[in-house]
Amino acid sequence: MYQRFWYKFYDAKVSSYYFQFYAISARRKKTIVSAICLLATSAFLLQMSQNTTNHLVWIVLVISSQLVALFQPLFPYEKQYHAACYIYEDVNQLCSEMEAYWRTIGAETSDEEINQKIILFSDKQDKIENRFATADLFPQSQRMHAKAVKNADYYFRGLN
């Protein structure tokens, strides 16, 4: 039972890192699109002020870049960012609870008690992930998962 609990704890920590990296990636995408819209609008306005012809073309380009900035909250990475932040915070709290319980497990702890905790923590993790995210909101990213596994390994090396 100790081994099963340890694997569940490890899985929760990997999940925590995974959603942390997803939030970072989504925030990066958000920043990049905002910067592109800002630079495009500035460049178009500068060009429009210097060019006396084709004002309509420059006005359309400025408006289109502003529309992209306006509809940016509707892009999927905006939802990913907010959902990943909430999931990360809650799963990280769950990992803290699991770590506190791991430190209390001793030889006198029964397998039944450990099994109940495994079920309890699994249910909590499922509820956290299902509450904030739909299945299609977070497409699998092998790169982020590998990075999360690597960071979890570093974390658990320091825990022992």
Model-assigned labels for residue ranges:
Residues 40-44, 61-68, 72-75:
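Membrane-embedded alpha-helical transmembrane segments of multi-pass integral membrane proteins
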Residues 40-54:
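Juxtamembrane "helix exit" motif at the C-terminal ends of alpha-helical transmembrane segments
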Residues 1-39, 71-160:
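Conserved non-transmembrane functional hotspots
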